[in-house]
Regions:
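Short, Lys/Arg-rich N-terminal segment immediately upstream of the first membrane anchor
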Residues: 1-2
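Hydrophobic membrane-insertion alpha-helices, especially the h-region
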Residues: 5-22
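Ser/Thr/Pro/Gly-rich low-complexity linker/stalk segments immediately outside membranes or between
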Residues: 24-38, 42
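Short, hydrophobic/aromatic-rich segments at coil-to-beta transitions
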Residues: 28-32, 54-57, 103-113
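Secretory pathway targeting signatures of secreted, lumenal, and periplasmic proteins
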Residues: 36-85, 113-119
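Surface-exposed amphipathic alpha-helical segments
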Residues: 45-47, 135-168
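Sec/Tat-exported extracytoplasmic proteins
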Residues: 51, 87, 91, 159-163
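Signature of long, low-cysteine stretches enriched in small and polar/charged residues
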Residues: 88-135, 142
Length: 168
């Protein structure tokens, strides 16, 4: 075998190794995606899309009954204003017990308990901006707060601008 063929085999093996590492560490390669306006979202493992419109997507985990509602708000909406408006409306209701609320540089979050409802007892609302859009996420039926934060970070990290939707 010629030295050129050995070099070609080494480059080929290195290329295949790099492709394997890229695919194994990617959140979107080989995963299901959904589109909200012109932004794609990668579905977390174990979740399916139970409702899908142009500006909203509902993700559901059948094993744990956890539900995530992701909504793209109006184009001119500011996530801090949306957060303040929602917090003000929740404070006005008697049967709502707000457990946690905060705002940082990337998102605003309200965690509350609805005393009068048996179906949606613990609800967490998250408002944030990404890809020139304002989004709200609503988490329902989550019993593990660590898992909820993990799903929230996964969704925010995998939101990507979908260039295929805007080809003109």
């Amino acid at each position: 075998m010629d030295k050129r063929w050995i070099g070609i085999l080494i480059v080929l093996i290195a290329g295949l190794g790099c492709m394997y590492l890229i695919v194994s560490n990617s959140n979107s390669v080989g995963s299901a995606v959904s589109v909200i306006n012109d932004v794609t979202i990668t579905l977390p493992p174990g979740y399916i899309t139970s409702e899908d419109t142009s500006n909203m997507c509902v993700l559901h985990n059948k094993q744990t009954n956890e539900t995530i509602r992701i909504r793209c708000l109006d184009d001119g909406a500011d996530y801090i204003n949306e957060y303040n408006n929602r917090l003000k409306s929740l404070n006005g209701e008697d049967d709502i017990d707000i457990q946690k609320n905060f705002t940082n540089k990337t998102l605003s979050m309200i965690k509350y308990e609805n005393q009068s409802s048996t179906d949606k007892k613990d609800i967490t609302l998250v408002f944030f901006e990404k890809c020139k859009h304002t989004f709200s996420m609503q988490f329902e039926h989550f019993t593990n707060e660590t898992n909820q934060e993990k799903m929230m970070n996964f969704i925010i990290d995998t939101l990507k601008y979908d260039f295929k939707q805007n080809t003109g």
